[in-house]
């Protein structure tokens, strides 16, 4: 486990701001299926990650030779499995969980990410003791409970899901927890490579891996035929998601991960849920319910509590 360097007040503010902005971009991912409803989740995933790889390759090209000299076989191997854990495997688990157990159950399980990352981060050398993080964890858990209750009520109690679906959701939770923790620890020990460059290299690796998804997604799919206008819209959506959610969002997240203690970074993941909810309210043209407002307030309160604990 790496030792977390002391975080100055300025670094704390900049890191938290980067984490919040990352969440605002990541929240847009949940609107993509609404914009191109005729395409499957596998096609959206393959398209997004292929676009991510192309954009990342173009942006990292000027620094490619220097990075090749800086990175050894160990770093490239790490990039490969981080790309699998944080992107490819994570999404495949989520897609199968939604298919087998329903979106409500999946969202509730994935919503535990802030808690799992924070708990793992609390074991790092130099991290705050868990008792000082207890208030933020309790606030986050209460917020997630509100979301779960609201989701179950909206689904009229039919959100139990099958055992395979629950297992896949748990797999997604483990996959992204491993990614968040390992990525943060690697960023802390990297020398001569910026957080943004590491994000772009992850994109290049993810794009290469997405080629394997493209075959079943586009060549073997038995789906509806799409016209030129639909494909053009699809291309626009996946490239927008790649640029804003993957390149900008992941770059900002890596900056936060490199600047902040892992326990605090874990709490910032809630902003993906918060912004996704706000975008959903705007898309559905409705006001949040009382439980939804309570959930958002509790989730933000958990982050504020965690940040305050790290200032003391």
Q: Each PLM stretch: what is its role?
A:
Residues 14-22, 66-93, 164-172, 225-248, ...:
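Loop-to-transmembrane-helix transition segments
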């Amino acid at each position: 486990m790496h030792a977390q360097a002391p975080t100055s007040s300025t670094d704390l503010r900049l890191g938290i701001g980067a984490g919040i902005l990352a969440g605002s971009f990541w929240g847009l991912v949940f609107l993509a299926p609404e914009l191109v409803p005729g395409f499957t989740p596998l096609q959206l995933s393959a398209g997004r990650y292929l676009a991510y790889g192309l954009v990342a390759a173009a942006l990292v090209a000027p620094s490619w030779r220097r990075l090749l000299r800086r990175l050894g076989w160990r770093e490239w191997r790490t990039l490969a499995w981080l790309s699998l854990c944080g992107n490819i495997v994570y999404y495949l688990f989520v897609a199968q969980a939604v298919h087998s157990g329903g979106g409500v159950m999946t969202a509730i399980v994935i919503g535990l990410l802030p808690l799992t990352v924070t708990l793992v981060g609390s074991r790092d050398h130099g991290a705050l003791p868990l008792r000082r993080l207890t208030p933020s964890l309790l606030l986050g858990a209460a917020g997630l409970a509100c979301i779960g209750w609201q989701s179950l009520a909206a689904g009229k109690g039919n959100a139990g899901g099958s055992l395979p679906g629950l297992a896949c959701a748990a797999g997604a939770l483990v996959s992204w927890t491993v990614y968040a923790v390992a990525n943060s620890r690697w960023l802390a020990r990297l020398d001569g490579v910026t957080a943004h460059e590491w994000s772009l290299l992850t994109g290049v690796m993810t794009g290469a891996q997405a080629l394997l998804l493209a075959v079943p997604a586009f060549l073997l799919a038995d789906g509806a035929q799409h016209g030129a206008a639909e494909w053009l819209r699809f291309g626009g959506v996946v490239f927008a998601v790649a640029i804003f959610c993957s390149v900008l969002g992941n770059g900002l997240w890596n900056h936060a991960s490199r600047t902040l203690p892992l326990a605090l970074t874990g709490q910032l993941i809630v902003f993906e849920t918060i912004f996704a909810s706000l975008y959903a309210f705007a898309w559905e043209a409705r006001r949040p319910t009382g439980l939804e407002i309570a959930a958002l307030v509790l989730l933000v309160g958990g982050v504020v509590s965690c940040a305050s604990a790290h200032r003391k």
